[in-house]
């Protein structure tokens, strides 16, 4: 299968290149860029220099259906809203890694993203690509809205508990930490080395745009928004840890929680449940498509505490996009994603 990437020079795009280059079902990768057409990716990024790459191309909708079968959009907000429709009309399947198509309410999107939403009809076509919970609809989709990094970590931890009626659905607090690559490649004072090294900081207090995405998806499972979600920036490049607190809806035990999570993810190759009261760390999933989940029932407070870790560029972006690509086209779900985490 021949695939294309728009936004190949960003961090998520580069991760897509790494994964798709080793995918057993991918025969060709075309890289597209309007700002850097004519450049070669291995000149821009020397870690790719041993591979032979065609120059970055401008998109020509009259030719694109003859060049590729699937397009990955690893682009900033607004680009997918413009390009997804024409790409679908050209006969391609589209996997969008941006937030343009995740929110079904246009007013909510415009409030949180501070920009116009996608055209009417496009959002309705998009399937939310949380691989472990939307497999049946992903398998028949032509357009995937790949989940955000924070929502992926939070949703995988919370859906089993909400589904089982284990927590008070209006008591959820999500306290999340992310590495600097989650902010993208463009340098800012927020991610400057001098600002992040030996530093730990809160940001976008009560205003992060992943908040309505988490609320929208949890509402489908019976949760009652609003919830509290707060991200922090950690002095590391990759990784997310979401520590989640919720009031138990009934007396629980760690044994019950273990059974709940093991049952929910029995057939999920990329979700690993910690045993015997152990908890995950971001290093445990570094460079992989895994989500590791640990948990505890605090009898003293009557709260459930859950820790969920992912690599934000993998399970939080490119890895889950490739997982959805596999599901859409009937490939083994793990194809191209079998690499074990890098450690230390």
Swiss-Prot record:
Alphabetized Pfam families for the sequence: Semialdhyde_dh, Semialdhyde_dhC_1
UniProt-recorded Gene Ontology molecular function terms: N-acetyl-gamma-glutamyl-phosphate reductase activity; NAD binding; NADP+ binding
InterPro entries according to UniProt: AGPR_AS (IPR023013), AGPR_type-1 (IPR000706), NAD(P)-bd_dom_sf (IPR036291), NAGSA_dehydrogenase (IPR050085), Semialdehyde_DH_NAD-bd (IPR000534)
E.C. number: 1.2.1.38
Keywords per UniProt: Amino-acid biosynthesis, Arginine biosynthesis, Cytoplasm, NADP, Oxidoreductase
PROSITE patterns found in the cross-reference section: ARGC
Protein name: N-acetyl-gamma-glutamyl-phosphate reductase
Record organism: Shouchella clausii (strain KSM-K16)
Pathway: Amino-acid biosynthesis; L-arginine biosynthesis; N(2)-acetyl-L-ornithine from L-glutamate: step 3/4
Gene Ontology biological process: L-arginine biosynthetic process
This protein's record includes keyword Cytoplasm: yes
């Amino acid at each position: 299968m021949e695939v294309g990437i728009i936004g190949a020079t960003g961090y998520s795009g580069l991760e897509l290149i790494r994964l798709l280059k080793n995918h057993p079902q991918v025969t060709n990768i075309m890289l597209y860029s309007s700002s850097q057409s004519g450049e070669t990716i291995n000149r821009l990024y020397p870690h790719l220099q041993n591979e032979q790459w065609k120059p970055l191309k401008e998109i020509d909708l009259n030719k694109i259906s003859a060049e590729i079968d699937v397009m990955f959009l690893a682009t900033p907000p607004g680009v997918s809203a413009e390009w997804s429709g024409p790409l679908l009309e050209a006969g391609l399947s589209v996997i969008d890694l941006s937030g343009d198509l995740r929110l079904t309410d246009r007013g909510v999107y415009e409030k949180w993203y501070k920009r116009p939403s996608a055209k009417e009809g496009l959002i309705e076509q998009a399937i939310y690509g949380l691989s472990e919970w939307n497999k049946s609809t992903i398998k028949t989709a032509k357009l995937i809205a790949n989940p955000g990094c924070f929502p992926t970590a939070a949703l995988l931890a919370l859906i089993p508990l909400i589904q089982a009626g284990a927590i008070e659905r209006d008591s959820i607090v999500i306290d999340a930490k992310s590495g600097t690559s989650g902010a993208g490649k463009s340098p800012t004072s927020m991610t400057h080395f001098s600002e992040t090294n030996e530093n730990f900081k809160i940001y976008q207090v009560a205003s992060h745009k992943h908040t309505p995405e988490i609320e929208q998806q949890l509402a489908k499972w019976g949760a009652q928004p609003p919830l509290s979600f707060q991200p922090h920036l950690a002095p590391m490049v990759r990784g997310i840890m979401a520590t989640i607190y919720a009031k138990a809806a009934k007396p629980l035990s760690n044994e019950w929680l273990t059974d709940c999570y093991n049952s929910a993810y029995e057939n999920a190759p990329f979700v690993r449940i910690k045993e015997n009261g152990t908890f995950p760390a971001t290093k445990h999933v570094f460079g992989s498509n895994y989500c590791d989940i640990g948990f505890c029932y605090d009898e003293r407070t009557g709260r459930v505490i859950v820790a969920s870790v992912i690599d934000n560029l993998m399970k939080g972006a490119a890895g889950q996009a490739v997982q959805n690509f596999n599901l859409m086209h009937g490939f083994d779900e793990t194809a191209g994603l079998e690499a074990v985490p890098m450690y230390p």
